[in-house]
């Protein structure tokens, strides 16, 4: 909770990644990736609840065996659709979508994103970073075209390189009703 606002962290995770199948169960220093992400989320000062959202029973079983909450969802092409599916069933003011492949998330960064979003009364926060050499040619780095602080477009390989293209970070922070409405955009 931050400023009397409840915050649920949802970690979307699936086994069928095209670039790295079974990625959530890959071990990092002896612990599965999805658990490392949940462990990072647990260090935030503000999350009232942490839920792993998955279409895979094996992930749900693993997560629950470690004391975390997990929900089964339908199959989805994007993480935001997976999070949106469960958003209407959440009793919270905000939802933080923490990507299931972000095991090195600094809890201070997560907390800053929450503070920034709530303090500025934003509907959504999607942080970006400086472009590094090779980012624009790397299909594993999602690029964002930004104009006046607003995200206009996301892509894997930029079709046009401009000064307004930045790599995104694997974090999305929403007012619950905003992510709940996301499923209606299809």
What is the role of each PLM region?
Residues 15-17, 100-103, 131:
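Short glycine-rich anion-binding loops that position phosphate/pyrophosphate groups of nucleotides
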Residues 47, 92, 119-123:
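Short, high-confidence coil segments that cap the C-terminus of an alpha-helix
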Residues 3-53:
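N-terminal glycine-rich phosphate-binding loop and ensuing alpha1 helix
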Residues 51, 57-115:
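Short phosphate-binding loop-to-helix
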Residues 12, 97-99, 127-128:
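Short beta-strand segments
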Residues 106-186:
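Conserved core of the sugar-phosphate nucleotidyltransferase
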């Amino acid at each position: 909770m931050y400023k009397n606002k409840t915050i649920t962290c949802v970690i979307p995770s699936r086994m069928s990644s095209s670039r790295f199948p079974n990625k959530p169960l890959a071990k990092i220093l002896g612990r599965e990736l999805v658990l490392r992400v949940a462990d990072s989320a647990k260090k935030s000062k503000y999350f009232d609840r942490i839920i792993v959202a998955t279409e895979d029973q094996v992930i749900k079983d693993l997560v629950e065996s470690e004391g975390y909450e997990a929900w089964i969802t339908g199959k989805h092409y994007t993480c935001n659709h997976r999070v949106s599916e469960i958003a209407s069933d959440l009793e919270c003011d905000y939802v933080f979508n923490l990507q299931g492949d972000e095991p090195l998330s600094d809890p201070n960064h997560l907390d800053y994103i929450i503070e920034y979003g709530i303090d500025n009364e934003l509907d959504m926060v999607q942080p970006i970073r400086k472009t590094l050499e090779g980012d624009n040619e790397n299909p594993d780095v999602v690029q964002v075209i930004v104009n006046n602080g607003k995200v206009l477009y996301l892509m894997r390989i930029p079709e046009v390189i401009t000064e307004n293209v930045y790599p995104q970070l694997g974090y999305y922070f929403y007012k619950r009703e905003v992510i709940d409405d996301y499923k209606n955009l299809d």
